[in-house]
From Swiss-Prot:
Keywords: Cytoplasm, DNA damage, DNA repair, DNA replication, DNA-binding, DNA-directed DNA polymerase, Magnesium, Metal-binding, Mutator protein, Nucleotidyltransferase, Transferase. This is DNA polymerase IV. Poorly processive, error-prone DNA polymerase involved in untargeted mutagenesis. Copies undamaged DNA at stalled replication forks, which arise in vivo from mismatched or misaligned primer ends. These misaligned primers can be extended by PolIV. Exhibits no 3'-5' exonuclease (proofreading) activity. May be involved in translesional synthesis, in conjunction with the beta clamp from PolIII. It comes from Streptococcus pyogenes serotype M28 (strain MGAS6180). The gene is dinB. Gene3D superfamilies: 3.30.70.270, 3.40.1170.60, 5' to 3' exonuclease, C-terminal subdomain (1.10.150.20), DNA polymerase, Y-family, little finger domain (3.30.1490.100). It is an enzyme of class 2 (transferase). Monomer. Mg(2+) binds at residues 18, 116. The record marks 23 as: Substrate discrimination. Belongs to the DNA polymerase type-Y family. It is found in: Cytoplasm. One of its GO terms (cellular component) is cytosol. Pfam families: IMS (PF00817), IMS_C (PF11799), IMS_HHH (PF11798).
Length: 364
C-alpha cells in the first residue's frame, strides 16, 4: 500500500484576523443611531422591485437568520424592520488600508484574503515578541483604538487552524490552538466547519458516515483519496492538524476559475451545457467564498485532438451571479466554430476581480 509521509511543521506562529461584520460595523461606527438595530448591506428590495442580494449584515440582523448571499427580498421578509444600506466601497477600502498598516507594524508577512481578513506570520516579527497571542491582542487593541472596530483572532501553528480558531469565538474573540490541543479541537468540530469543505463534499462525507473531525480521523488515507482525489489527501492531514501552506505576502488573487478534464469525451450539447453550468456554479461559489466580484468571463475548451480554444467576454458590470456566468459562458461556446472532435476539457475563469459590496441584481 502506498503511504504518504506526514510532515507537520509546528514551529510557526500564525494569526488569522477576521473583522467582525466589517461593512456593517463601519456603517454603525459612522452612524451611532444604527447600533442595536438590524443592519443589512445591500439594496433595499422595496426600491428595486425585490431584486438584489445581501453583501453582509450585522450580528443583530443575523439573529433573524439573515446572511450574506441571501436575496434582499428574503432578508426583508425575515426582518421587515431591517435597515438596508447600499454600501460605500471606497470608504470600506480606506478603512481596510488603515487596518493593513496596523498589521505591517508587526510583520511584513501578511496575506490578505479579502478586504476584511488576513493571515499574518509572526514567527519572526518586527518587535521580537515571542508570544503570538500577545501580538494578536495588541492588534485587536490597535484596531479598536485607532479604527473603532472589533475583530476576531485565531492563533495557531498553521493557517488552517488559525482560520478555524478565529471563527470559534465571535465577535471580538481570541482563540489559541496549541499543537498538543489540535486533535481535540478538531475532533469536536462538525465537518462543514472545516475550511475548504464545500456543500457537495459535506454531502459526500455525510454519506460516508463522516460528521465530525473525530469521524474523519478514523478514515484511512487511501479511502479519502479514492473518494476525493487530491482533496482527500488534504483532508487526511487536516484531520490531524497538518497544513503546511505558507503565508504569502501581499497575495493578490487575479482570477478565480474552475475546469475539469473528462476521461469520457463530451459530444452532446446537453452534456456540454450541463458541464458549463457546473463550472459556472463552482466559480460563483468561489467568488462568494473569496468575497470577490468579476467582470471578464473566460471559457476554455480543449478538444480530443488537443486543440485548445480560449475566448473571453467583458461585462459592463461586476458580477458573481451563477446564472449570468453560465449564460455568458454558454453564449461563448455557441459562438465557437464547430469541431467534431469530442471535448476533453472545459473551464470557466473569472478575471478583472474586485473586492466590492455586492449590489448585484437577481431575478427573484
Amino acid at each position: 500500500m502506498l503511504i504518504f509521509p506526514l510532515i507537520n511543521d509546528t514551529s510557526r506562529k500564525i494569526i488569522h484576523i477576521d473583522m467582525d461584520a466589517f461593512f456593517a460595523a463601519v456603517e454603525e461606527r459612522d452612524n451611532p443611531a444604527l447600533k442595536g438595530k438590524p443592519v443589512v448591506i445591500g439594496k433595499d428590495p422595496r426600491e428595486t422591485g425585490g431584486r438584489g442580494v445581501v453583501s453582509t449584515c450585522n450580528y443583530e440582523a443575523r439573529k433573524y437568520g439573515i446572511h450574506s448571499a441571501m436575496s434582499s427580498k428574503e432578508a426583508y421578509e425575515r426582518c421587515p424592520k431591517a435597515i438596508f444600506i447600499s454600501g460605500n466601497y471606497e470608504k470600506y477600502r480606506t478603512v481596510g488600508d488603515q487596518i493593513r498598516r496596523i498589521f505591517k507594524r508587526y510583520t511584513d508577512v501578511v496575506e490578505p484574503m479579502s478586504i476584511d481578513e488576513a493571515y499574518l506570520d509572526v514567527t519572526n516579527n518586527k518587535l521580537g515578541i515571542k508570544s503570538a497571542v500577545k501580538i494578536a491582542k495588541l492588534i485587536q487593541h490597535d484596531i479598536w483604538k485607532e479604527v473603532g472596530l472589533t475583530c476576531s483572532a485565531g492563533v495557531s501553528y498553521n493557517k488552517f487552524l488559525a482560520k478555524l480558531a478565529s471563527d470559534f469565538e465571535k465577535p471580538h474573540g481570541l482563540t489559541l490552538v496549541l499543537k498538543e490541543d489540535a486533535l481535540c479541537f478538531l475532533a469536536k468540530l462538525p465537518i462543514e466547519k472545516f475550511h475548504g469543505v464545500g456543500k457537495k463534499s459535506v454531502e459526500k462525507l455525510h454519506d460516508m458516515g463522516i460528521y465530525t473531525g473525530q469521524d474523519l480521523l478514523a478514515v484511512p488515507e487511501m479511502t479519502l483519496i479514492d473518494h476525493f482525489g487530491r482533496f482527500g489527501f488534504d483532508l487526511y492531514r487536516k484531520a490531524r492538524g497538518i497544513s503546511n501552506s505558507p503565508v504569502k505576502s501581499d497575495r493578490i488573487r487575479k482570477s478565480i476559475g474552475s475546469e475539469r478534464t473528462y476521461a469520457k469525451l463530451l459530444y452532446q450539447e446537453t452534456d456540454i451545457k450541463a458541464e458549463i453550468s457546473k463550472n459556472a456554479k463552482r466559480v460563483a461559489a468561489l467568488l462568494q467564498d473569496h468575497k470577490k466580484l468579476g467582470k471578464t468571463i473566460v471559457l476554455k475548451v480543449r478538444y480530443a485532438d488537443f486543440t485548445t480554444l480560449t475566448k473571453r467576454v467583458t461585462l459592463p458590470e461586476l458580477t458573481r451571479n451563477a446564472a449570468q456566468i453560465e449564460q455568458v459562458a454558454g453564449d461563448i461556446f455557441d459562438s465557437l466554430s464547430e469541431n467534431p472532435a469530442g471535448i476533453r476539457l472545459l473551464g470557466i475563469t473569472m478575471t478583472n476581480l474586485e473586492d466590492k459590496v455586492a449590489d448585484i441584481s437577481l431575478d427573484l
